[in-house]
Amino acid sequence: MRVALGIEYDGSSFCGWQRQLEVDSVQAQIEKALSYVANEPITVSCAGRTDTGVHGTGQVVHFDTDVQRPMTAWTQGVNANLPDSVAIRWAKEVDDSFHARYSATARRYRYVIYNHKLRPGILSAGVSHYHGDIDETLMHKAAQLFVGEHDFTSFRALHCQSKTPFRNVHQVNVTRQGMYVMVDIQANAFLHHMVRNIVGSLLQIGLGNQPIEWITELFALKNRKLAAPTAKPNGLYLVDVTYPEHYQLPKLALGPLFMLD
């Protein structure tokens, strides 16, 4: 039997999603709790591996097991054995053809900026604080230059292991809700640090340090060192993963909880 799970987590206390020796990870906590409920070792595959400090409201995983359990065991039972910062949001038996990573057709991230002169005391690990005056309208205009298929060499980590720098961005929107500025981006897939590097460069435009046309120049230069510094991890959320409709996976509010959809 193959089971898919929807997962939400606060990544601030973990060294990323992927299981690692000697440090805590979201994957390790999920597999530990699942193995306890199943009474056998369980290994999961995920839709997207998030970095240290990055959060998820729409992460999807799958695992295989011959153990017979009601679906509530994979939600309520597993949640009872997880730390407060990790939660199973739904569980569904799926066809063996389903794969959390390879069946996905798109991923969606949201980056939340707290734009205020003073830093926040609450939610400080869930937002990125920038005190300068940000023009979200300029950021949104510049963001449209990312839409479509491009060579994102200037916007991926120098140590990115992907064989190709090309990705297809479906949409990017920059909006403001009071003191919060949100960058919402969806693509077929993402390169390492791609979202945070895009946000870092958009912030330079929103702060008035660069013109909108700078993005076009960066695409042409294909040089990561000439783009802006990588934005901080704590404002980034994996909020949704898209799959073919025939899998009929549950859909929840994108989140994070304190933001309006």
Curated annotation (Swiss-Prot):
UniProt keyword annotation of Signal present: no
Catalysed reaction equations from the record: uridine(38/39/40) in tRNA = pseudouridine(38/39/40) in tRNA
Pfam families per record: PseudoU_synth_1
UniProt-listed CDD domains: PseudoU_synth_EcTruA (cd02570)
Residues at the active site: D51
EC number(s) given by UniProt: 5.4.99.12
Coiled-coil residues: none
Residues reported to bind substrate: Y109
SUPFAM superfamilies xrefs: Pseudouridine synthase
Keywords tagged on the record: Isomerase, tRNA processing
GO molecular function, one term: RNA binding
Keyword tRNA processing annotated: yes
GO annotation (BP), single: tRNA pseudouridine synthesis
Assembly description: Homodimer.
Similarity remark: Belongs to the tRNA pseudouridine synthase TruA family.
Record's function text: Formation of pseudouridine at positions 38, 39 and 40 in the anticodon stem and loop of transfer RNAs.
NCBIfam families, sorted: hisT_truA (TIGR00071)
Protein name: tRNA pseudouridine synthase A
The encoding gene: truA
